Regions:
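Catalytic glutamate of the conserved HExxH
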Residues: 109, 113-117
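Active-site rim/adjacent substrate-binding subdomains
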Residues: 1-105, 117, 121-126, 132-140
């Protein structure tokens, strides 16, 4: 007897996982992202693909759009809402290719994009993952 494959997680199911992840973030982090909107879509839109020079829409798992906290100013308010996009199909492909837990993949992508909200570069975040600490910060 063969198993009937279950359908891939829906946009709403990924949103629920992302919302659960947000609830588990430390208060110090969560406090600064209350106004950030989380959106789930199947793929980045074609303009994003072109602007980022993607070879494939599967090359991008998530994206932060907005003005990072290190560049915000009360003298120059931005009218746009800060948003984090999670792209369902690329995330699901990555999940299938790696065999990692889906919630772990979503958490990793979400925290990576939150890092951009804080003004961290990809290089900063790679360093943090490798070293386990934020450059320039020490614990007393």
């Amino acid at each position: 007897m063969t198993k009937t494959p279950s359908p891939p997680p829906s946009l709403n199911e990924l949103k629920a996982i992302a919302e659960t992840t947000l609830k588990t973030l430390p208060d110090e982090l969560a406090h600064h992202i209350t106004d950030v909107v989380i959106r789930i879509s199947d793929f980045p839109d074609p303009k994003i693909e072109r602007d980022m020079g993607l070879r494939s829409p599967f090359d991008l798992l998530g994206l932060y759009q907005g003005v990072s906290l290190d560049r915000k100013s009360v003298c120059d308010p931005t009218p746009d809402v800060d948003m984090i996009f999670l792209y369902r199909r690329p995330i699901l492909d990555y999940w299938c290719e790696t065999g990692e837990d889906l919630a772990h993949v979503i958490r990793h992508v979400l925290i990576h994009e939150i890092g951009h909200h804080f003004g961290l570069s990809d290089a900063d975040m790679e360093w943090i993952e490798k070293e386990g600490q934020v450059p320039g910060f020490t614990c007393a």
